[in-house]
């Protein structure tokens, strides 16, 4: 297996300014990871000064449907713009390389594409999604940006890149009755800029989950070898077992780095 010199990312939320912020600094100083992917919860710009104290590279993740952001519906347009402007502020102040967006739920992919294009955000990346939303949690039915055609439409219209979420892709493949690893290969043709990674317990499920690396059934070594490009940014999006420590994340990173060297 070829060593890909992957750059690993820690996923945090803007409200995580208590224990996780200090833990992030400690682990970064130890060389455990390379950047923070920061999900900006709406109306939390008061936390920006705390994140600015860290001398760590950032990627920004715009808020999604659970926080009222839905690019797929025209009636959300005004609030979508307000939420985006807060993410833009974080990205500007933290010198973030990218801002990641979800395509929304239900609605229409053309609306998603046009609203994202209206931001004129050169750092924008669209993240591929599962085909179906999590039941009893997301309040909708179908995710935009789950298929090759919708992703191409959004990327072409908004002139944006793609954030390739491996787990989301497997979920979408199952909903579309496509062999999961074959669908991963198909998505690779869209030339993704960066990646999200967690393990997968049920490789036949249409629903998203985030188990720790090495605890599920995803062939992570295959993903590294066949999907990730040289020097890729890979945000590890596994569940956090503690509200104070990030040692579980550290173990995930060790597993990922070991997979590169086999």
Regions found by a protein language model. Name each.
Residues 70-161, 248:
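Active-site acidic/histidine proton-transfer and metal-coordination neighborhood
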Residues 35, 59, 125-127, 163-166, ...:
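Generic enzyme active-site microenvironment
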Residues 1-7, 22-29, 81-97, 157-161, ...:
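Histidine-acidic metal/acid-base catalytic patches
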Residues 12-16, 77, 138-142, 173-174, ...:
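Short, flexible loop segments at the rims of nucleotide/cofactor-binding pockets, characterized by
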Residues 40-57, 89, 110-118, 148-155, ...:
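Short amphipathic alpha-helices and their capping/turn segments at secondary-structure boundaries
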Residues 11-15, 39-41, 63-65, 104-106, ...:
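Active-site beta-loop-alpha junctions enriched in small/polar residues
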Residues 30-34, 129-137, 167:
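Short, basic, glycine/proline-bearing loop/turn elements
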Residues 1-86:
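N-terminal pre-domain/capping segments
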């Amino acid at each position: 297996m070829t060593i890909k010199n992957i750059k690993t990312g820690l996923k945090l939320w803007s409200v995580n300014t208590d224990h996780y912020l200090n833990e992030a600094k400690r682990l970064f100083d130890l060389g455990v990871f390379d950047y923070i992917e920061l999900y900006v919860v709406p109306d939390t710009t008061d936390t920006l000064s705390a994140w600015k104290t860290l001398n760590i590279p950032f990627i920004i993740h715009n808020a999604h449907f659970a926080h009222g952001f839905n690019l797929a519906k025209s009636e959300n347009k005004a609030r979508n713009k307000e939420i985006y402007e807060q993410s833009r502020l974080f990205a500007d102040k933290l010198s973030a390389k990218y801002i990641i967006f979800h395509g929304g739920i239900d609605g229409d992919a053309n609306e998603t594409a046009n609203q994202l294009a209206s931001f004129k955000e050169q750092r924008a990346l669209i993240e591929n999604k599962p085909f179906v939303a999590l039941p009893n949690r997301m309040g909708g039915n179908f995710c935009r940006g789950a298929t090759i055609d919708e992703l191409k439409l959004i990327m072409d219209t908004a002139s944006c890149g793609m954030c390739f979420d491996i787990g989301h892709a497997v979920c979408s493949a199952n909903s579309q009755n496509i062999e999961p690893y074959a669908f991963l290969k198909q998505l690779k043709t869209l030339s993704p800029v960066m990646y999200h990674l967690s393990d997968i317990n049920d490789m036949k499920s249409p629903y998203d989950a985030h188990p720790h690396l090495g605890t599920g059934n995803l062939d992570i070594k295959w993903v590294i070898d066949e999907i990730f490009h040289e020097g890729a940014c890979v945000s590890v999006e596994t569940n956090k077992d503690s509200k104070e420590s990030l040692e579980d994340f550290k173990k995930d990173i060790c597993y990922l780095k070991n997979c590169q060297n086999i």
